[in-house]
């Protein structure tokens, strides 16, 4: 959530920054400012009426001591109380509406974020690894998986509908090996592993920014008023909801493996075939809770930690800086890591590493006490390390052989016996 104080103090800066994402956000800021002015006016009026009520109450006390009639003053106080009550109801409505508007305003962008309209304007930062060359006709991961009897899309569809899959035997073991490998590398890099709930309260998703804006993307359990998590970022960040940390506790580094659940409501017709875009998929997540002064150094560290996984797996990838029109709602700056997918002859996203600055911390009330004793909001960062299903896709396609086998990356030999599956 953007600070209302910042909007009040420097509205033009806020509007210009948000306009890099969407010109129409300027109007929302104007609406918030009008409501804020109305709110402050009503607060002032309530305070004045309370002062008047108190003064008249004292006057009544004085008159009663003198044995004088106080009926007219008592009627005035009754009317004042009615007006205060009415104003307080109006104030509560204004504050609720203002909060609703603020919760739908995205984060401010860091000055280094490139301007652009969509993913075509993202800026490539680096490439790593050699793109493999094949002397045979390659298969995409879906066809290869079905051919080998490792993936069953038809039965998954019969069980659950479209965009689900069943992994079998060696491929299921390879996915499990990847999860363990990723968690162990993350632990080596100083992240504490956690096992977190997969069902969360609505307010938990408000804290990380998925609600209220992206409700249609989420699976909701109505009877229990709980949502299935779209990413482990949600419970990991909220571990410190309504908490005041010690400055010396920072940074806090967390990692978790979870299945993730997304309705993909806006993805009709995209990646219909295969494992790239599923309603349920495995992901290993990284979250950092850090001091505001070091959050951009921590973003580079987060990116490096996610890259290390791909480097150890010897999978070619590139890093892009997301432009203003493609960056996520809660992020101030984001790097995407895109892995090479031979069958598509292009790089595809496998991780997003974002600095949300204090945007999530304000929504989830996450603070730390600095050395002067002042409570300040922390900065939060998150990144995939990695999307397991897409990593599996990349291995299947980049490591495939002429006889339709899949070679095992060297670093996974401790997890899976043999050269190929």
From Swiss-Prot:
L-serine binds at residues 231-233, 285, 384. ATP binds at residues 262-264, 349-352. It is an enzyme of class 6 (ligase). GO terms for molecular function: ATP binding; serine-tRNA ligase activity. Pathway: Aminoacyl-tRNA biosynthesis; selenocysteinyl-tRNA(Sec) biosynthesis; L-seryl-tRNA(Sec) from L-serine and tRNA(Sec): step 1/1. InterPro entries: aa-tRNA-synt_IIb, aa-tRNA-synth_II, aa-tRNA-synth_II/BPL/LPL, Ser-tRNA-ligase_type_1, Ser-tRNA-synth_1_N, SerRS_1_N_sf, SerRS_core, tRNA-bd_arm. Keywords: Aminoacyl-tRNA synthetase, ATP-binding, Cytoplasm, Ligase, Nucleotide-binding, Protein biosynthesis. Its EC number is 6.1.1.11. Its main location: cytoplasm. It holds the Pfam family tRNA-synt_2b. GO terms for biological process: selenocysteine biosynthetic process; seryl-tRNA aminoacylation. GO terms for cellular component: cytoplasm. HAMAP family: Ser_tRNA_synth_type1. Homodimer. The tRNA molecule binds across the dimer. Belongs to the class-II aminoacyl-tRNA synthetase family. Type-1 seryl-tRNA synthetase subfamily. Catalyzes the attachment of serine to tRNA(Ser). Is also able to aminoacylate tRNA(Sec) with serine, to form the misacylated tRNA L-seryl-tRNA(Sec), which will be further converted into selenocysteinyl-tRNA(Sec). This is Serine--tRNA ligase. The lineage of its organism: Bacteria, Pseudomonadati, Aquificota, Aquificia, Aquificales. The gene is serS.
């Amino acid at each position: 959530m953007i600070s209302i104080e910042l909007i009040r103090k420097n509205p033009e800066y806020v509007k210009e920054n948000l306009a890099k994402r969407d010109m129409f956000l300027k109007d929302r800021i104007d609406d918030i400012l009008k409501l804020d002015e109305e709110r402050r006016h009503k607060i002032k009026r309530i305070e004045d009426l309370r002062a008047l009520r108190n003064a008249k109450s004292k006057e009544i006390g004085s008159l009663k001591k003198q044995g004088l009639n106080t009926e007219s003053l008592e009627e005035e106080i009754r009317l004042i109380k009615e007006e205060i009550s009415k104003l307080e109801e109006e104030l509560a409505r204004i504050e609720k509406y203002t909060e609703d508007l603020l919760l739908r305003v995205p984060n401010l962008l860091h000055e280094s974020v490139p301007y652009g309209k969509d993913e075509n304007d993202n800026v490539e930062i680096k490439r790593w690894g050699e793109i493999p060359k094949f002397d045979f006709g390659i298969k995409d991961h879906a066809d290869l998986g079905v051919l080998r009897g490792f993936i069953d899309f038809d039965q998954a569809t019969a069980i659950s509908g479209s965009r689900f899959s069943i992994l079998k035997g060696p491929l299921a073991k390879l996915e499990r090996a990847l999860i363990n490998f990723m968690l162990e590398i993350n632990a080596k890099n100083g992240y504490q592993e956690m096992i977190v709930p997969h069902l969360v309260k609505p307010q938990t998703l408000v804290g990380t920014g998925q609600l209220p804006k992206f409700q249609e993307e989420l699976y909701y359990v109505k009877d229990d008023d709980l949502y299935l998590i779209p990413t482990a970022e949600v419970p990991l960040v909220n571990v410190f909801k309504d908490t005041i940390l010690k400055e010396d506790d920072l940074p806090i580094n967390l990692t978790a493996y979870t299945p993730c659940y997304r309705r993909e409501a806006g993805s009709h017709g995209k990646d219909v075939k295969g494992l790239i875009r599923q309603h349920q998929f495995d992901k290993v997540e990284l979250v950092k809770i850090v001091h505001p002064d070091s959050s951009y150094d921590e973003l580079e560290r987060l990116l490096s930690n996610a890259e290390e996984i791909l480097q150890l797996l010897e999978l070619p990838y590139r890093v892009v800086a997301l432009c203003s029109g493609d960056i996520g709602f809660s992020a101030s700056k984001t790097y995407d890591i895109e892995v090479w997918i031979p069958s598509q002859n292009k790089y595809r996203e496998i991780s997003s590493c974002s600095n949300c600055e204090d945007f999530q911390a304000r929504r989830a009330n996450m603070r730390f006490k600095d050395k002067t004793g002042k409570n300040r909001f922390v900065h939060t960062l998150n990144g995939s390390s990695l999307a397991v299903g897409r990593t599996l896709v990349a291995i299947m396609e980049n490591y495939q052989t002429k006889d339709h086998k899949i070679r095992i990356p060297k670093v996974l030999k401790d997890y899976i016996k043999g050269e190929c599956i």
